[in-house]
Amino acid sequence: MNNIITFLPFLSIFITGIFYPVGTYKHRPVFQPPNWFFSVAWTYITLSLGFITNKFINQQNNNNIKKNILTLFIFLLFLLNGWLVLNHYKLYKESFWLLIISCFTSIVYIIYLSSLNNLKNLIWFLLPLPFWLVLASCLNGVIYDYNK
């Protein structure tokens, strides 16, 4: 179970990306990072999300807390994978709002983990997730506005 949680975010987004690839856009926002940066950022974000979630679950003795962590974790993965599907079908408005919800969910997840009294130093490694989702929301918003 430990390795499944660690690699689940990476594998789920990788597999979803194979079935629902993100297309190229006619309009590229000026603040968009180069294409190679996306694979580096998502690899770090997904592996850190899985690794830190695994660490927190293994440190918990309370099954209710484990269940809460897993519920938020699975919901966040559902949102992140859902964006790929919506974006693939060019549902830009819906994918924009899904990114906003994903960003808020990631912040709730980080706050929940930081409320637990162990491993607080690992929370810092999750901070790129909401920042990246804010950037992705901005990029998606520009693409949505351009394609209206």
Pin down the residues of each PLM region:
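N-terminal membrane topogenic signal
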Residues: 1-8
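Hydrophobic alpha-helical membrane segments
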Residues: 72-83, 95-111, 132
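Membrane-interface helix caps and helix-loop-helix hairpins in membrane proteins
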Residues: 63, 84-96, 115-120, 143-147
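Membrane-interface loop-to-helix entry segments
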Residues: 35-47, 89-102
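Membrane-interface helix termini and inter-helical loops of multi-pass transporters
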Residues: 22-32, 60-62
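Terminal transmembrane helical module of multi-pass membrane proteins
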Residues: 112-148
